[in-house]
A protein has these predicted regions:
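Ferredoxin-type iron-sulfur electron-transfer modules in oxidoreductases and energy-metabolism complexes
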Residues: 288-309, 327-423
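Extended amphipathic alpha-helical segments enriched in small hydrophobics
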Residues: 308-318
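Short, positively charged and aromatic/hydrophobic N-terminal segments
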Residues: 5, 11-13, 27-29
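Conserved hydrophobic/aromatic pocket- or pore-lining residues that grip, position, or stack substrates
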Residues: 321
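Iron-sulfur-associated redox domains of electron-transfer enzymes in respiratory
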Residues: 33-34, 38-296, 301-304, 335
């Protein structure tokens, strides 16, 4: 039922001036110490599936290696007490030594007793905004003579390296690949950005259990596919290091430029224990078995009316969701009527106007709009795209102002299903 991430194709890259100089220095050496020889041989042998040890103190080298390849590194930063995805140029840009405590309608950052680089769960943003911009000009026209001329759109495709991509976010990208790349109409903006993106995944650990239920959805906490490199942060005693798994040839090319060595079995086991501990510490659970049929059979369940009485119809759940893609189109002209453009703007199915057709809106009640969102996310999405629209990240729970919990609503409907005593 769940869609695996689309494999990333290797792309050719030019050797940087730094790399050429470094190669020249190696060739000019008369003798190479035995330790360096072994390290270079191990680096040369790196291939997909290899796992290496990267000391936390050498993490800056990974950022620099990505920058040398022309990538704009984007990852979590701390801004105004929130986790925000922004440009990462140095390790200090990360929320080092912070953790995120979250529950329904609650999110706050608190200091940690250690210097973990990734000791927090997901914030309100996802990487969707970089692959599928919330505002986009689709085309522009100009009046010429007796007609209109379509103006070319020459957007320079940004080259992002996404840092700290959780397994649930990898699944969200795979879901959006199904929407924007594998349908009848391919989205050229999404395709260009997705093909360029370098993915540094992060296996979850060292964080508050929060509102996540990725284990229930089969999407985490360990990244299994769709990445160039995957990190597992290990803190044990005085040791602080990363076990880095190579996912693609591009990933191997980058990690070769970073001080590292092959991870031994004890280090690999330590990383596996971090992920296993996280898997056993989920904040929520949801049984996906038969969920589509349960929702279809309870379209008029009284729970829809009850949750509508709490829902503010603010659309927060759709804005923070890493897979929601509802949008609207707007046409605009200049005052002279000689130039115009069509814009795509992120929208929400919780707005009254979203379902507007000639004569009025179809979903006029909060009940109908919440039911549409939840049923689409967990049921009709499966019919439409062959996978669930929910990846279990828990953002919709955390960022709901009144703390509506998707997992609780589904459980309530199941426990009082059609034919059972009503609430």
């Amino acid at each position: 039922m769940f869609l695996d991430a689309v494999p990333l194709e290797p792309y050719s890259t030019l050797k940087s001036q730094w790399s050429n100089k470094r190669i020249g220095r190696w060739r000019d050496r008369v003798a190479v110490p035995e330790r360096e020889t072994k390290q270079s041989m191990a680096a040369a042998a790196l291939e997909v599936g290899a796992r290496v040890r990267l000391a936390a103190g050498d993490f800056q080298h990974l950022l620099e290696a990505l920058a040398r390849r022309g990538y704009q590194v984007v990852g979590p930063t701390r801004e105004d007490g929130q986790l925000i995805y922004g440009e990462i140029g140095k390790v200090a840009d990360l929320p080092v030594g912070w953790t995120a405590v979250q529950e329904g309608g609650t999110f706050r950052l608190e200091p940690r007793p250690d210097q973990a680089l990734f000791g927090y769960g997901v914030g309100q943003q996802s990487f969707k905004q970089f692959l599928w911009p919330p505002h986009q000009i689709l085309w522009q026209v100009r009046r010429e003579g007796g007609g209109w001329r379509l103006l070319p759109q020459a957007e320079e495709v940004p080259k992002f390296a996404f840092l700290g991509v959780r397994a649930c976010e990898l699944q969200a990208m795979a879901v959006q690949d199904r929407v924007f790349l594998q349908g009848v109409h391919v989205d050229p903006v999404y395709r260009g950005r997705r093909e360029q993106a370098f993915i540094v995944a992060l296996n979850c650990g060292h964080q508050d259990k929060g509102t996540c239920f990725c284990v229930s959805m089969g999407t985490g906490p360990k990244a299994t596919t769709g990445f160039d490199l995957a990190l597992t942060e290990v803190l044990q005693g005085e040791e602080h290091f990363f076990v880095v798994e190579v996912g693609t040839a591009r990933g191997a090319e980058i990690i070769r430029q970073v001080p590292q060595r092959m991870a031994d079995q004890q280090e690999i086991d330590a990383g596996d224990r971090v992920v296993a501990a996280m898997a056993g510490n989920m904040g929520r659970s949801l049984d996906p078995a038969g969920i589509k049929e349960a929702l279809y059979a309870n379209y008029e369940h009284p729970r829809w009316e009850e949750v509508a009485g709490r829902c503010l119809n603010c659309g927060n759940c759709t804005l923070v969701c890493p897979t929601c893609f509802c949008h609207t189109l707007e046409d605009a002209m200049d005052m002279a009527g000689t130039e115009g453009e069509r814009r795509r703007r992120l929208d929400s199915c919780f707005t009254v106007d979203f379902s507007y057709l000639h004569g009025g809106s179809i979903r006029t009640s909060p009940k109908s709009r919440y039911r549409q969102w939840l049923t689409h996310k967990l049921a009709t999405w499966i019919d439409q795209f062959g996978c669930s629209g929910c990846v279990g990240c828990g953002r919709c729970i955390t960022w709901c102002p009144v703390g509506i919990d998707l997992t609780e609503e589904v459980r309530a409907i199941r426990e009082t299903a059609a034919g059972a005593p009503k609430e």
